[in-house]
């Protein structure tokens, strides 16, 4: 029966001390695919190390440690089930990882769970101006995660106070509104990740709370629309030569469907080749769909002709093309000085890493409302949002964010850190000089 349930990717946002690991661990522990034996083993180790109070977070820590050591653990460990859905937790431990995962993410999050701590120091730290939590919420919204649930955590540390809950709810709700969420429709749930209050069952310690439990709230989310019906796009993660088979590009299907027999183009190059077979986890697939990480065999193409960052598409259905310029909305997160025209940092978009030049800063815009506040500003700095015209220094395949989200969002990197994030609005194609995008890039 379980097969018919829709899969939803859940990104958990929260300050390191918000208790998000304990909350997530507790849910996975109660509803997930962790077998009893594993849990008992973890509990025993946890007790021996005197970490009894971190039991649920410990579950997650162990999974992370095993994952980081390269032990392939059953992905079911990161899943939990509600009456309507299978949820997969996309956990992003650190700030840098969070930004990286949100942009080039192994999977696009459909829903965000924001965990904020109710304890006095905790909330102020997590939700201060400098707190990364706010930035992560803004990033999630900018990158298309429009559904969010808020867990007001550690209620056990404030004696399950309704006043404290209301105070936090007001502040977080105001911020969500500013960012652009429909805050009146967002569930704010008083929880204790450790004690389990209002996670799965209603707690008798919060008789004043009449709303849903965390799981009930997650179960009311709208299922994601998977882009099966869009033209095919597969950003290549690598290209391998396999004895007896030949050239095998590897990547994740972002949109569309791939079947053997299709004639593929590898943009931005002019290489065209027929797909002979498609495999996932060593099994031959009749068709690969969005979200599938696959390898596929192509005829008469050498490993030297195609590479990571190229995008495979169907020659007969709106094939991908290289792009000579594009305009994008960027949010500057972290730059020590000012960014002016001519700045040329590295751009990470899907699997490609290419230097791009800021041709022109077209306008500075209000992050919240999207309205233009200044035309052609001389410079932009941390905290600013702007519309900019960019030029890749090498041929590059990108798409508009509205048409192909995974190929239309990017991170700008410089000085070994993420300087900005952006989404692409308009393209100028490299196609015999013709502009085939929906709207030409601003000059």
Swiss-Prot record:
Keyword Translocase among record annotations: no
CDD domains cross-referenced by the UniProt entry: EF1_alpha, EF1_alpha_II, EF1_alpha_III
Keyword Nucleotide-binding in annotation: yes
MF GO annotations: GTP binding; GTPase activity; translation elongation factor activity
Region (G4): 153-156
PROSITE patterns (alphabetical): G_TR_1 (PS00301), G_TR_2 (PS51722)
Annotated tr-type G domain residues: 5-228
Annotated SUPFAM superfamilies: EF-Tu/eEF-1alpha/eIF2-gamma C-terminal domain, P-loop containing nucleoside triphosphate hydrolases, Translation proteins
Region described as G2: spans on this chain: 70-74
Location relative to the cell: Cytoplasm
Pfam families xrefs: GTP-eEF1A_C, GTP_EFTU, GTP_EFTU_D2
Domain of life from the UniProt record: Eukaryota
One GO term describing the cellular component: cytoplasm
Region entry G1, spans: 14-21
Chain sites annotated for binding GTP: 14-21, 91-95, 153-156
Main location: cytoplasm
Stretches the record annotates as G5: 192-194
Region described as G3: 91-94
Listed HAMAP family: EF_Tu_A (MF_00118_A)
Entry function: This protein promotes the GTP-dependent binding of aminoacyl-tRNA to the A-site of ribosomes during protein biosynthesis.
NCBIfam families: EF-1_alpha, PRK12317.1
Family in the record: Belongs to the TRAFAC class translation factor GTPase superfamily. Classic translation factor GTPase family. EF-Tu/EF-1A subfamily.
Protein name: Elongation factor 1-alpha
């Amino acid at each position: 029966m379980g097969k018919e349930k829709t899969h939803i990717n859940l990104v958990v946002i929260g300050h390191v001390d918000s208790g998000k690991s304990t909350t997530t661990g507790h849910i996975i522990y109660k509803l997930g695919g962790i077998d009893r034996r594993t849990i008992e083993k973890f509990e025993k180790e946890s007790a021996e190390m005197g970490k009894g109070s971190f039991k649920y977070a410990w579950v997650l820590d162990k999974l992370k440690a095993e994952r980081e050591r390269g032990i392939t653990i059953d992905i079911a460990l990161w899943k939990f089930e509600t009456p309507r859905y299978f949820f997969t937790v996309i956990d992003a431990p650190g700030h840098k990882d969070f930004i990286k995962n949100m942009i080039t993410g192994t999977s696009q999050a459909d829903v965000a769970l924001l965990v904020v701590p109710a304890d006095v120091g905790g909330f102020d730290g997590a939700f201060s101006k400098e707190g990364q939590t706010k930035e992560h919420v803004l990033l999630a919204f900018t990158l298309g995660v429009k559904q969010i649930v808020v867990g007001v955590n550690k209620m056990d540390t404030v004696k399950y106070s309704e006043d404290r809950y209301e105070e936090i709810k007001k502040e977080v709700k105001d911020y969500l509104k500013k960012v652009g969420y429909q805050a009146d429709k967002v569930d704010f749930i008083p929880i204790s990740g450790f004690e389990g209050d209002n996670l799965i069952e209603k707690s008798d310690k919060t008789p004043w709370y009449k709303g849903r439990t965390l799981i009930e709230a997650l179960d009311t989310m709208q299922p994601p629309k998977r882009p099966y019906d869009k033209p095919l796009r597969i950003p290549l993660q690598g290209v391998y030569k396999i004895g007896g088979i030949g050239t095998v590009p590897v990547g994740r299907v972002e949109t569309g469907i791939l079947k053997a027999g299709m004639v593929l183009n590898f943009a931005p190059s002019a290489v065209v080749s027929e797909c002979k077979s498609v495999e996932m986890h060593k099994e031959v697939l009749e068709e690969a769909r969005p979200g599938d990480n696959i390898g596929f065999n192509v005829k008469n193409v050498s490993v030297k002709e195609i590479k990571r960052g190229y995008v495979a598409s169907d020659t007969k259905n709106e094939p991908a093309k290289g792009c000579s310029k594009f305009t994008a909305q960027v949010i500057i997160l972290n730059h020590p000085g000012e960014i002016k025209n001519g700045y040329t940092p590295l751009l990470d978009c899907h699997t490609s890493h290419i230097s791009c030049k800021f041709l022109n800063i077209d306008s500075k815009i209000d992050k919240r409302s999207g309205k233009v506040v200044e035309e052609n500003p001389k410079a932009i700095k941390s905290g600013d949002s702007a519309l900019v015209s960019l030029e890749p220094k090498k041929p590059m395949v990108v798409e508009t964010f509205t048409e192909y989200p995974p190929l239309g969002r990017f991170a700008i990197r410089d000085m070994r850190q993420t300087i900005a994030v952006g989404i692409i609005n308009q393209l100028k194609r490299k196609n015999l000089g013709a502009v085939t995008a929906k709207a030409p890039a601003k000059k």
